[in-house]
Amino acid sequence: MADVRKLKNYINGEWVESRADKYEDVINPATGEVLCQVPISTRAELDQAAVIAEQAFEKWSQVAVPRRARVLFSFQQLLIQHKEELARLITLENGKNLSEARGEVQRGIENVEFAAGAPTLMMGDSLASIATDVEAANYRYPVGVVGGIAPFNFPMMVPCWMFPMAIALGNSFILKPSERTPLLMEKLVELFSEAGLPKGVFNVVYGAHDVVNGILENEIIKAVSFVGSKPVGEYVYKTGSANLKRVQALTGAKNHTIVLNDADLEDTVTNVISAAFGSAGERCMACAVVTVEEGIADEFLAALRTAAQNVKIGNGLDDGVFLGPVIREENQKRTIAYIEKGLEEGAKLTVDGRETGLSEGHFVGPTILEDVTTDMTIWKDEIFAPVLSVIRVKNLQEAVRVANQSEFANGACIFTNNAKAIRYFREKIDAGMLGVNLGVPAPMAFFPFSGWKSSFYGTLHANGKDSVDFYTHKKVVTARYSLKGYEE
């Protein structure tokens, strides 16, 4: 194998060779090609970045808010100019098709755009008269050094709802990107620096357990934002909180889609295919379970099977490909094991994605399991792959009861034209993000990404006004100004 480039950490505005004695291959999941190697950095390197970030915070937090916003606007413009390059990097190291990658880049740009509104977002409140000659004002201040732990499945969108907002509000930031998708972050760092961000304000340390524990334990770091699996999210929340940090942990999901008898059949099938199998099912807003009313079930499922069997599978850089690979071979094997567990427990496999006919890469085709029940492993666990479970129900009330049994409560969708049914769904379903006649109800940057139950640990969600509250603390000033001597 030819020499493979070893990535460096980004600390204090410089690319710094890691002191790690271990590197991991970064693999194109569609081909198996080794793209580069990423360091599994040491705790000492994270601690070094924390000291640098703390020093940078002292100056950056004093920069006028409009000036900070201009850096974010410049960053946004550079992202727009490099949109295609960024999308291709995502497809290369993550595997999702190029159209989906372009969509992710656009969502990342929108996150930066929202953060660039810092002058408005930072505004406090005031009351001119709370008592005789007494007024009060509420001011926002940045919390300090913030740590972020990002996943592989959205290597641009998720980090871009973390560090741009935190930095725009006056904080400094240390990011641990996924070691599976580091190349995109390398490009983002380059563009953020070009936009005029001072050295030390944004730092990137690649790694695994030691870096995560450093973020959670280092006293310099005041807040931690995490996106990833439920077990790791629980650990992050408990450990970070025990060390007196603010923590938001966005974790697993098992999103249910309800299809009622009056649903538009063609539109619903199109949306469910996209929601279940887009991004290879590796997203926390994927449709994992469909509960379909008996009156439309046969017709809907026949159309769904046909559509799933016609999905084009392959390298996301190739024209017309809809479904790319899962991220690694171990994910592929894990997914196949879940499918076989479903069969053992009595589910009916009506579309089998275990064999795709592709000789290289880590592919699982669209898979549909019917006759699923809520005691089955495939219904309970987050599979994080292009596997869809189907449950037939008698009515909306039963569909909601099924969904609400899940420990997860990230998103849920309904397909119907019945306003009463929509209202019932909205009021009774346990989930933080709801979709009506659409398959992926991920909100825009100015609304919170608001999972419930085991899908989220913390108080303040990512994005929206919650993110402003998360990355700032408040100072209320009460002042007396006597008007004595100015009487008319």
Curated annotation (Swiss-Prot):
Binding of NAD(+), residues: A150, F152, K176, E179, R180, S229, T251, E382
Q: Which reaction is the catalytic activity of this chain?
A: 3-oxopropanoate + NAD(+) + CoA + H2O = hydrogencarbonate + acetyl-CoA + NADH + H(+); 2-methyl-3-oxopropanoate + NAD(+) + CoA + H2O = propanoyl-CoA + hydrogencarbonate + NADH + H(+)
Task: Provide the E.C. number(s) assigned to this enzyme.
Answer: 1.2.1.27
Q: Name one GO molecular function term.
A: methylmalonate-semialdehyde dehydrogenase (acylating, NAD) activity
> Might you name a Gene Ontology BP term for this protein?
thymine catabolic process
For this UniProt record, the keywords arranged alphabetically read as follows: NAD, Oxidoreductase
| UniProt pathway annotation | Polyol metabolism; myo-inositol degradation into acetyl-CoA; acetyl-CoA from myo-inositol: step 7/7
Q: Where is the active site?
A: C284 (nucleophile)
Which Pfam families does the UniProt record give?
Aldedh
Q: What does this protein do?
A: Catalyzes the oxidation of malonate semialdehyde (MSA) and methylmalonate semialdehyde (MMSA) into acetyl-CoA and propanoyl-CoA, respectively. Is involved in a myo-inositol catabolic pathway. Bicarbonate, and not CO2, is the end-product of the enzymatic reaction.
Which family is this sequence assigned to? Belongs to the aldehyde dehydrogenase family. IolA subfamily.
Q: How does it assemble?
A: Homotetramer.
Q: What is this protein called?
A: Malonate-semialdehyde dehydrogenase
Task: State the organism of origin.
Answer: Listeria monocytogenes serotype 4b (strain CLIP80459)
